[in-house]
């Protein structure tokens, strides 16, 4: 079985989270581990991926949007989405050479991870033709936006546990106008987010065939500095 590391954090500012991803990326690139799974939450922030759609997917004046949350353009695929407390953001920094060099398969497995996680709570979720992510009926519960460099993945998924969904009302999330968003809480499941994280790690391990050892942020920094 592949060997990886998991880093569980609390609420981390978006740009700080990006720096953590880059440190993890370097560790994976050096072959020190097959993959690092980072789990955290962000303060309220909107991010816009490389597919753009900036003007048509923001439904309020830009100044009003920026009063509600930070706004960044980022390297992942996709259009605009929201991150905030109550949402688990998972950044799998995986070397696909250890699996298959197939980005579509990787995305499929990310979706499968969340579908299996929701099964644990009695929620029937699935995929929707033409769209990425995980859906419950016509509402998206998990968005996916990744980037790949040298067959190593970064960015990842955003899974709504008890997110304040009103933030999504200011945008066309992922550029989608005809469907909405949901969360575990909206579906009647009130679970502690740390418990959901634990189950998510288990499902990542199951779907990707990887055993995780937990590390701390300090440990990651020490490793990064030692190899610099």
UniProtKB/Swiss-Prot annotation:
The keyword Acyltransferase applies. Pfam families: LplA-B_cat (PF21948). Catalyzes the transfer of endogenously produced octanoic acid from octanoyl-acyl-carrier-protein onto the lipoyl domains of lipoate-dependent enzymes. Lipoyl-ACP can also act as a substrate although octanoyl-ACP is likely to be the physiological substrate. It is found in: Cytoplasm. Belongs to the LipB family. Residues 31-212 form the BPL/LPL catalytic domain. This is Octanoyltransferase. Its main location: cytoplasm. InterPro entries: aa-tRNA-synth_II/BPL/LPL (IPR045864), BPL_LPL_catalytic (IPR004143), Octanoyltransferase (IPR000544), Octanoyltransferase_CS (IPR020605). The gene is lipB. Disulfide bonds: none annotated. It is an enzyme of class 2 (transferase).
